[in-house]
Structure formats: C-alpha cells, structure tokens
Swiss-Prot record:
It is a peripheral membrane protein. It comes from Cupriavidus metallidurans (strain ATCC 43123 / DSM 2839 / NBRC 102507 / CH34) (Ralstonia metallidurans). Belongs to the ATPase alpha/beta chains family. Keywords: ATP synthesis, ATP-binding, Cell inner membrane, Cell membrane, CF(1), Hydrogen ion transport, Ion transport, Membrane, Nucleotide-binding, Translocase, Transport. CDD domains: ATP-synt_F1_beta_C (cd18110), ATP-synt_F1_beta_N (cd18115), F1-ATPase_beta_CD (cd01133). It comes from the Bacteria. GO terms for molecular function: ATP binding; ATP hydrolysis activity; proton-transporting ATP synthase activity, rotational mechanism. Coiled coil: none annotated. HAMAP family: ATP_synth_beta_bact. Its EC number is 7.1.2.2. This is ATP synthase subunit beta. The keyword Ribosomal protein does not apply.
Length: 467
C-alpha cells in the first residue's frame, strides 16, 4: 500500500508521483486519501493507472470529478485493479462504474468482487448458437432475425428511435425471458435511465435486472469503464451457467469517452480525431461479450451513427463484431413508419435457409426484392408519374407500398404517446402475413389498412372498416 502525491492535474487526467520502488501497475486503482482537508474534492475519489511515465510518476484517469484536486494531495495505491460486486446481490439495484449503489437502497450484499479487466474466453470454450430469438417485432424477425447468444447492433442517427426500439426489445424479450438481464447505460441521458428503471419496476421484473449507469454528465473515465463494469456482472452470471441478456445504450459513447481520454493522455489522434487504439478498445470489450459452453450472453447494443454516416470509424468498427445489424433510417422515420428499420440495409447471419428454414428465407428475400424494385422505380415515378410504368412495375410498386406500411407496428412502450395498444407478433404470423402480401393475396386491400397493425388478420379487419 504505497502512498503518492499528485504532481499535475489536467481535466480528468492526473499525474501522481510514487516512490520508485513502489510504482503501481497499469490498470491498478488508486484512492484519494481522506486526510486532504479544506478541499471540496470528491471523498474517496478513485483513479485508474493508464501509463507509467518513469521516475515513479504514473498517469491516471480520475473516475469521478477532478474538481477540487490540487498538487501535493496524497493518494494511496490499492495494489489491485478496480473490482465491482457481482452475483445475485446486484439484481434489482442501480450502480455506478465502481459498483457503488446509487439507488439509496442500502449497501450491496454481494458474495464476490471481480476485477473489471478480464481476458476474453479462449477459443475452445466458445459455443456458437443457431437458435432464433423471437422478438415479436415483424421487421426484425423477418429480415434480420436475432440469435440466442448472439450480438445485435441497433444503428441510427439522432432521434430515429434507437432507445425506443431497445426498450421495446427489453419489453418483449426480458419480460418473456425468465432469465436475468444486465443493463449498462453508457453516456446516455439520465432521463432514459430513469424511464428504464420505472419500466422495469412497473412490470415486476426489477428483481431480475442489474443496472449500471455512467451517464452523459459524468467524467470520461466513468463513461469509458462503465461498459466493462456491466459486462463483468454479466460474465459472472454466464459463468454460473445462465443465459443472460446484456443491453448497452450506447456503444458510441464508450468510443467517445475513449477519444476524450486518449487526447488528454497525449496520444496522436487517428482518422476523424478518434483514438489510435479504437479497434483494440472495441475488440477488448466485444470479444468478452460472448457465449461459452457454460452459459450464454445475448447482447443488444445501441450504436449512435454520427451525422447518419455509417462509414464513420466508430460504427464501422462496431459492425465487425456483430451477428445482426438493425439499421434505423431517417428517410423511413420521415414517412411516419415506426420502427424505422431499413429492411434493405439491415443484415443477419441467421438469415440462412439452413437456420431459419426455406419458407422464411424465401419470403424475406422476396420482400427485399419487391422493396428494392420500388426503390429503383422511385426516380422514374417522381419525374414521369405512375402512369408511365408497365403493369408489372405498377403491381410491384403497389405491393411494395403495402409491405412498407405492414413493416410498421405499434409498440408497447409507446402506448403512452400514441394511444394505440402495442402488438407482439409471433414469427409464424409474420411469415404468413408477408407471404400473403408477396403472393398477391392482399392486392385488393387499400394500403392504409396495413399501417400500424399487428398480424395480417388485423389488416383485413381494418380494411373492412375503411370501406
């Protein structure tokens, strides 16, 4: 337990000098000593060692506000990395990056503490899965189905519905799924964390969820490490042989926190100002989110896309690690079609006839072909109008517009705003509905009948009312 002194403080990055023979190791946790009186610095502020500069000086990130720090303050080395409580004591609780409770419900009684930096499971321990995870959301189940124990990314710019989609997935999967969930709020709005907590509480599944938050207002050190804290809790449940759901909102803020810290640590920036270690940091996190022979982690991650540019280094690096990508499009949101999932841009490794079956695969591909044809004809329609199209093309456009509307769906979590009850559509119903559409069995129905309904039977009922 060596003691050092602060020698320099620049924002969240603090240099601390220790005796040369007692320098802390990289990733060790250091704690601000209590005896630093007359300072309004955070009590028990934790630092994480990032670099050893030599001569006994280490460069650290403060995991908390660095306000009130000054040179000469004494800091104690703990001799170990940051460790957080794991296990059943964390369920139903809200914690910060260090695993401290922030829900004012007393201390967390955990049977074990684990370091947040762990190695990814070995290759021979991994267990690939091909079982489908039904979400009840038509467009996702049809075009980009999820795998149990797979990794899913929800990509979208600002305000196209990533968080609402994630809340609906939590509503449909976490409530039906009898297992445990871990939610990591990384650099998002505190209001959304609050909404999530109340959503879980009202539906009586709070005792199956562990929540870890490092929100927008927190220093970059917290936002950088909070994803690892949540993941460490999920890994413990997985190692017990359970099937875990791990939600992260938002992976982009994890990258952004890394960028802020990287600049303060004096590293040379790479493309678009990102940290040079972007791929490594993302890989370290994503390779740990995996299913082993003992248990599985199914992870659903929201990914903010800066300026709607999917080629930006941050979303582009995230793409590499995922099994399914759900791309939300501003153009579709502008048409009033929610969820605003782009069925032509979204992909899934599960969409394979050997996994989902021939019928599902063929229906999904025919739906995509019809929508693609409509996309190609849109310019001609804009210039010359519908009358100039051949009868086959007119039919394709008519079907595509119906398919486009049938891909919309009322959400349970949006009932409060829309006033229409949410719909959960089983996979068989989804396939049956879209098969009828592409086979031309619904050509006589008006396209309004397909907007914001659940199954195809509801569309027929709505059509009767419209006549």
């Amino acid at each position: 337990m060596s003691i050092g002194n602060i020698v320099q403080c620049i924002g969240a990055v603090v240099d601390i000098e220790f005796p040369r023979d007692a320098m802390p190791k990289v990733y060790d946790a250091l704690v601000l000593e209590e005896g630093n009186d007359k300072s309004f610095a955070e009590k028990g502020l934790t630092f994480e060692v990032q670099q050893q500069l030599g001569d006994g000086v280490v460069r650290t990130i403060a995991l908390g506000s660095s306000d009130g720090l000054r040179r000469g303050m004494s800091v104690m080395s703990t001799g170990a990395p940051i460790s957080v409580p794991v296990g059943h004591g964390t369920l139903g609780r809200i914690m910060d990056v260090l695993g401290r409770p922030i829900d004012e419900a007393g201390p967390i009684e955990a049977d074990e503490k684990r370091a947040i930096h762990q190695k990814a499971p070995k290759f021979d321990e991994l267990s690939p899965s091909v079982d489908l995870l039904e979400t009840g959301i038509k467009v996702i189940d049809l075009v980009c189905p999820f795998a149990k124990g797979g990794k899913v990314g929800l990509f979208g710019g600002a305000g196209v519905g990533k968080t609402v989609n994630m809340m609906e997935l939590i509503n449909n999967i976490a409530k039906q799924h009898s297992g445990l969930s871990v939610f990591a709020g990384v650099g998002e709005r505190t209001r959304e964390g609050n909404d999530f907590y109340h959503e879980m509480k009202d539906s009586n599944v709070l005792d199956k969820v562990a929540m870890v938050f490092g929100q927008m207002n927190e220093p970059p050190g917290n936002r950088l490490r909070v994803a690892l804290t949540g993941l460490t809790m999920a890994e413990r449940f997985r190692d017990e042989g359970r099937d875990i759901l791990f939600f992260v909102d938002n992976i982009y803020r994890y990258t952004l926190a890394g960028t802020e810290v990287s600049a303060l640590l004096g590293r040379m920036p790479s493309a678009v100002g990102y940290q040079p270690t972007l791929a490594e940091e993302m890989g370290k996190l994503q390779e740990r989110i995996t299913s082993t022979k003992t248990g599985s982690i199914t992870s659903i991650q929201a990914v903010y896309v800066p300026a709607d540019d999917l080629t930006d280094p941050s979303p582009a690096t995230t793409f590499l690690h995922l099994d399914s990508t759900v791309v939300l499009s501003r153009d579709i949101a502008a048409l009033g079609i929610y969820p605003a999932v782009d069925p032509l841009d979204s992909t899934s490794r599960q969409l394979d006839p050997q996994v989902v079956g021939t019928e599902h695969y063929e229906v999904a591909r025919r739906v995509q072909q019809t929508l693609q044809r409509y996309k190609e004809l849109r310019d001609i329609i804009a210039i010359l109008g519908m009358d100039e199209l051949s009868p086959e093309d007119k039919l394709a456009v008519s079907r595509a517009r119906k398919i486009q509307r049938f891909l919309s769906q009322p959400f349970h979590v949006a009932e409060v705003f829309t006033g229409s009850p949410g719909k959960y559509v089983p996979l068989k119903e989804t396939i049956r509905g879209f098969k009828m559409l592409v086979d031309g069995e619904c050509d006589h129905l008006p396209e309004q009948a397909f907007y914001m309904v659940g199954s195809i039977d509801e569309a027929f009922e709505k059509a009767k009312k419209l006549q």
